[in-house]
Regions:
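Bulky hydrophobic segments
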Residues: 1-89, 95-98, 102-132
C-alpha cells in the first residue's frame, strides 16, 4: 500500500498538468509571473514526486543515474504535453516551455537526492520520502 501511495503524487500532478494544459489560455488562471517560471516550478515538483518511485538505496548508490532517469521521464512527459497543447485551440507548443519542463525535472531530481542524502545523514529511517 505504501508503494502505491508514494506513486500517487506524480500521477496526480501529471493529471492536473494535463487538465490545465487542455484549456485555452483564457480559461486557465495564470499568475503574473513568466510562464517559464511556472513550468520550471511545476515540473520541479513533478520531478521530485517521481523520485519517490525509486528505492532509497538506488539514490544513495547511483544518484546521477537516478537524476537522469527522473529528468528523462519528466522530459518525455513535458514533450507529450507540449505536443498535446499544439492541438488545443488557443494554445501552442513551445520549445522554451519544454526546456523549462526539463530543467524543472532535473531540479526536482536533485532535490529528491538531496532530501534522501540529508535523511540518511541525520539517521532517519523509513521517513516516507522515498521507497525503502
Amino acid at each position: 500500500m505504501k508503494k502505491i501511495i508514494l506513486k500517487l503524487p506524480a500521477l496526480v500532478t501529471m493529471g492536473i498538468s494535463w487538465y490545465l494544459s487542455s484549456g485555452t489560455l483564457e480559461t486557465v488562471p495564470l499568475p503574473s509571473v513568466s510562464d517559464k517560471l511556472i513550468h520550471l516550478v511545476c515540473f520541479a515538483g513533478l520531478g521530485f514526486f517521481w523520485t519517490w518511485w525509486f528505492k532509497k538505496e538506488n539514490w544513495l548508490q547511483k544518484p546521477l543515474k537516478q537524476i537522469l532517469y527522473v529528468t528523462l521521464i519528466v522530459a518525455a512527459y513535458g514533450l507529450v504535453d507540449e505536443i498535446h497543447q499544439y492541438f488545443v485551440p488557443g494554445r501552442y507548443a513551445s520549445a522554451l516551455d519544454w526546456l523549462a519542463d526539463v530543467a524543472g525535472g532535473f531540479l526536482g531530481g536533485v532535490a529528491g537526492f538531496v532530501g534522501t542524502w540529508i535523511l540518511k545523514k541525520i539517521g532517519t529511517k523509513n521517513s516516507g520520502s522515498l521507497q525503502s
